Structures are given as structure tokens and as C-alpha cells.
Amino acid sequence: MKVKVGVIFGGETVEHEISIITAVQAMKYIDPEKYEIVPIYISKDRIWYTGKMLMDIEVYKDFEHLKRYAKKVAFYKKNGTFVLQTVGMFKRVVEELDIMFPIMHGNNTEDGSIQGYLETVGIPYVGSKVLASAIGQDKVIMKQVMSSINLPIVPYTWFYDINYYDENEKILNEIKELGYPVIVKPATLGSSVGITVVKEESKIDQAVREAIKYDVKIIVEKVIENLVEVNCSVLGNYKYQEASVIEEVISTEEFLTYTDKYIGKSKGDTTKGMVATNRVIPARIDNKLYKEIQELAKETFKVMNLSGVARIDFLIDNKKKKAYVNEPNTIPGSLSFYLWEKTNKPYNKLLDEMLSIAIKDFKTKSKKIYSFDTNILSNFNGLKGGKGLKGIKK
């Protein structure tokens, strides 16, 4: 009997379209002999849809016109079964699911939001869990976690938008202490959205205000001179970690832009996702640094308690031959399958391993104790606060 996999993608996020591309790519490679795919698309206005038509990338080029052919649904646990049920007056179950596969990028989705919902319903799902996903989306918190075990990170400072207006001089001085040039980023966005490199103090205000358009939390990092950007994917969970080959990404700008990542040199075909990035595999770095980065990638994956596939991005000071952990991507674009193909792991096998890890993790978690019987409510005597609890010492 085939396992029914709900592939969930889209959502209200600036990385909506990238999520669609990654999901459609993955659905083509999930083994049809073992799994039955149920596409679940969340529109930008947060409406859930299902239907086999949603596996075709062409649908999304004119979705407003074609959406009437898809089914609007809600996700529930009903009589012990996970179901997609139509909305409206006459509700009916259209699909039963065994496991969810979130393929979503950015705020409101990848940041633990969708994972939290799936945890609440109780269905197994692929990838990192709520806390790991949330940390992986927040560039400030992730740096604090990484620095706690002395992983190498670039010097940085951070602040909220309201602090920038209320304590402007203090924050500008903190940025100045980093030393220009710096790079200004929204703290919880990905895909290089809202990012600006600032070479002189006179341009910092404009860059910060641009980042504030996208986020309330801003991070400013010291720019690494003689920069080489490399990425390494990791597959596994808290028990074991396997590192992929390392790619060297080629940017047309001072940092890897949205265009570099998802469009590359292509003229018209924007359906390749991260595959469109200009890259060299394996990265052109010496063997010692290569192995060091693979180990750092696995350490980062483990300390953040990631699961499934992640991509760890690194910055290398090519003059000093020193690598810095830039950030982990808990649901990387294209699921980094192109790195695993170069590691002799075809995409269908990668997806199968991700699903297997999720099922094993769910079984492990199911053996843990998360609730127990108490007599607190039976002794509760009205709404009198702590004094109404008989037999309980304060």
C-alpha cells in the first residue's frame, strides 16, 4: 500500500514563487511506486487548494483564471485520520494523508509556522521541527546559537526598527564600530530580499530603511573582503549527519542576489529554482578547508537540531583561508538536490531518505511521554485562583 504524501507549498511569503518551483520539481521525482502525491497549494491569500493540476508549473502562470478547477480544502484530523476536506456548506473528504512534506520558503511558512500547525494536528512531516525552523529563519537567534558552541561567524550587530528611530545615534555608532563596508539584512527573510551592501556611512540610513520595509528586526554584518561564497548541504537528523559536495556560487554582484540564485543567466526559463544559480562543483578550495567546511556544516546542522535536508551557507575570506558560517537554510531552494546528485545520491533517493527520516523521527517521538494523568481538575473548586485548588501546596 502506497504512503500518501501531502506536498504543501506556496503561502503568504515573499518567496512564494520559489516555493512553487521547488515543490513542482520535487513532486516529479518522488517515487510513484512507493508514494501517492497529494499537492496542497496555499495561495498568497492563505487559501488551501488541492488537485492533480497543481503539479503542473504552467497552472501558476494563470492561477487566478484556473483556480476554479482546483478544490478549496481545509486540513483536519477526523476520527483518527488526517484528511483534506472541502470547505463550504456541503463538506466532504477528498483526500486522506499519511505524512506531510512542507516545501515552503520564508516568513509565515518555513519559519516554524506551518510546522507548528502540523504538530498541533499531529501528523508526521518531513524536515526540521518548530523550534529549529524558527531559529533557522531568524539570522540573529541563529548566530547566538552558533556562537554558543564557538562556530565561526562574522562580526555583527542587530536592532529593531523602533530602536533605529529612538536610538539612532547609538545604533549608527555600533555599525561604525564594525567598520565599513557592511551588509544590511532583514533578520527573518531569505532569498537575498531587502539586502544592501553599504560602503560608506552616508548610505547606511537608506539601506536600513530599505530593510525595514520587509522586517521589524534588522541585522548588520561586517563584509568579508576577498569573498568566496560556498554552500554545503546536510542530510540527517540529531542522530547522524551526512555532508554533500561543496559548491562555489558565482555572483554577478557584491553578494548573491535573488537573480543570481533563481534566474542566473537564463532568459525566459525561470522554473529552475536554485539550479539556475551560476556555480562551480566542487568548490575551488584546498582540501583542508573543504573538509573543515563539511565538518562545520554537520556541526551547525546538529546544534540547531535540523532534520531532513538543509543547506549551510559559508563565507570564505580567500586571503586568510578562513571560513565563516553564514546561515543554515532549513528548506533550501530545490532542496539542494543538485549537490546530492554530485554526491552520487539521485533526487528520487534523496526524497525517499527524507521521508524515511521523518517517519522514523515520528515513531521515536511517539514513544516519549508528553502528557500524564493528574487529579488537579477533579480538586478544582471554582474560579478562586490558587486557593481553590485543594490539596495543592503553593
Predicted features and spans:
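ATP-dependent carboxylate activation and anion-phosphoryl transfer catalytic cores
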Residues: 3, 9-12, 150, 278, ...
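Glycine-rich phosphate-binding loop of ATP-grasp-fold ATP-dependent ligases
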Residues: 19, 153-158, 181-209, 229-231
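Hydrophobic beta-strand scaffold residues
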Residues: 37, 124-125, 153, 182, ...
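Short, glycine-/small-residue-rich phosphate/pyrophosphate-handling segment
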Residues: 137-157
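ATP-grasp fold ATP-binding core
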Residues: 146-147, 174-195, 216-227
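Phosphate-binding site of ATP-dependent enzymes
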Residues: 199-272, 284, 288, 292, ...
